[in-house]
């Protein structure tokens, strides 16, 4: 008897479970975007995100790190709607892994690499060109930049120094950081005598000063591509359009 009574109850419970869940009201719909962005984008992007939210009521949360780390996180399934890389290589990598929407990819902006020193350093107005002796300039100190094997700023730095004939002598003095902001911090704290970072980062840290600029033709062009991810929400389209607009400049 027990079996005969329980069977219908079991069936009814599953029938109830199978009913589609009611759609949330429009006000409860998810109005957020997650942006994975190169560390060097932080200051400018924080401002742009605030402006976009004020305009659209879509809240934007950004995660800043080295482009290499972000691309790997996307590959591992980390949730994000937008990816902004500090070089084309890691965006190409993400394209190959099918983690971005190629149709949405555009080049957003550019940058420069500069030589920096702590603000109280006596070094100034360093001419950077062929035969530039970076190793001698650093003395007994370290030279900070991003990991030259993975972090875009480090890759640009190595390319420039190789072209200028300064890499071989300077290589042993390098302190490789996980991101451009980490390299910047080493110089700002006085833990490195010199650093090679993006101009935009150097300008926002009062603890450092720019003492030289690398010739544009000494390294590949510094381009920041942006794209929606393969799993992006629909609001990502409006965000991308905003980043390219005059309002975000």
Question: Residue locations for each model-derived region?
Answer:
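Bacterial N-terminal signal peptides
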Residues: 1-11
């Amino acid at each position: 008897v027990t079996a005969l009574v329980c069977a219908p109850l079991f069936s009814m419970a599953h029938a109830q479970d199978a009913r589609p869940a009611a759609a949330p009201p429009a006000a409860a719909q998810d109005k957020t975007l997650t942006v994975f962005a190169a560390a060097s984008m932080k200051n400018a992007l924080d401002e742009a995100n605030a402006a976009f939210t004020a305009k659209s009521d879509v809240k934007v949360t950004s995660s800043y790190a080295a482009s290499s780390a972000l691309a790997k996180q996307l590959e591992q399934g980390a949730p994000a709607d937008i990816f902004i890389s500090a070089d084309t290589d890691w965006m190409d990598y993400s394209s190959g892994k099918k983690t971005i929407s190629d149709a949405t990819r555009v080049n957003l902006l550019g940058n420069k690499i500069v030589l920096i020193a702590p603000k109280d350093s006596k070094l100034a107005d360093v001419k950077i060109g062929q035969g530039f002796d970076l190793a001698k300039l650093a003395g007994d100190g370290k030279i900070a930049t991003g990991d030259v094997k993975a972090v875009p700023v480090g890759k640009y730095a190595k390319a420039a120094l190789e072209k200028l004939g300064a890499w071989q002598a300077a290589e042993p003095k390098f302190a490789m950081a996980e991101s451009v902001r980490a390299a910047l911090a080493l110089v700002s704290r006085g833990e490195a005598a010199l650093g090679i970072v993006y101009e935009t980062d150097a300008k926002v840290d009062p603890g450092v000063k720019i003492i030289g600029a690398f010739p544009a033709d000494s390294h590949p062009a510094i381009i920041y591509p942006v794209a929606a991810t393969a799993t992006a929400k629909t609001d990502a389209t409006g965000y991308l359009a905003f980043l390219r607009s005059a309002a975000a400049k």
